Regions:
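Acyl-donor binding region in acyl/amide transferases
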Residues: 2-158
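Flexible, glycine-/basic-rich loop-and-beta segments that form/coincide
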Residues: 158-168
C-alpha cells in the first residue's frame, strides 16, 4: 500500500481487517476494511437513520478504506471479482473477530482520479458525494477532494436493522 496506493499506508482506526489476494502464490491485490466515517450526508440520507440511530449502529457499517490491484496486474474483471469475494469474506470474518455482523460496506472514490467502474460492476450503489470537508473540518470549508459515496448492502433489510428502535 505504501508504495503503490495514492493514499499510501496509514493505520486504520478502530475495528479493522486486511486481505491480501493471491493466485498461486502471486500477490494480485490488497484490501483494507475498517471503521465507518462518522457523518456522511449522502450515506446517512440513503440509510434514513437519525443521529441517535447512527450513534448506536454506526459500527454495523464497515468502510472499504483501501483497495489496490497491483499496477502490473492486468486481468479483465479482476477488481470487481475481488470486491464481490471480499464482501462475502468480510461478512464471514467480521463477526469472528469482533462479535457482531456488519450490514453495509461503504467506500469513497475520489472523483478526479477514478470513475468507480469496478465498484459499479460489483453492484455497489452510488448514493451521492461527500462535501469535501474531511473528517476533521471545524471551519465548514472544503479542504479535501470531493468523493463519490458507494454502499454495498450485506443484509437484505439493512435499513430496518440500522433504523430499528429495538435491539439489533
Amino acid at each position: 500500500m505504501t508504495r503503490y496506493h495514492y493514499l499510501g499506508y496509514r493505520p486504520l482506526p478502530g475495528a479493522q481487517i486486511r486481505y491480501m489476494v493471491k493466485d498461486e502464490g502471486t500477490l494480485l491485490a490488497a484490501l483494507g476494511f475498517g471503521a465507518a466515517a462518522w457523518k456522511v450526508a449522502a450515506r446517512d440520507s440513503f440509510i434514513g437513520w437519525t443521529p441517535d440511530q447512527r450513534a448506536t449502529r454506526l459500527h454495523l457499517v464497515v468502510n472499504n478504506a483501501r483497495f489496490l490491484v497491483l499496477p502490473w496486474i492486468h486481468i479483465p474483471n479482476l477488481a470487481s471479482r475481488i470486491l464481490g469475494l471480499a464482501a462475502r469474506q468480510v461478512y464471514h470474518d467480521w463477526p469472528e473477530l469482533y462479535g457482531y455482523q456488519p450490514v453495509v460496506l461503504e467506500t469513497y472514490i475520489e472523483k478526479k482520479r477514478f470513475a468507480g467502474t469496478c465498484y459499479k460492476a460489483a453492484n455497489w450503489i452510488h448514493v451521492g458525494q461527500t462535501t469535501g470537508r474531511g473528517k476533521l473540518d471545524r471551519h465548514h470549508r472544503r479542504n479535501t477532494p470531493v468523493k463519490d459515496v458507494y454502499l454495498y448492502p450485506l443484509h437484505r433489510h439493512f435499513r430496518r436493522v440500522l433504523t430499528s428502535e429495538g435491539t439489533v
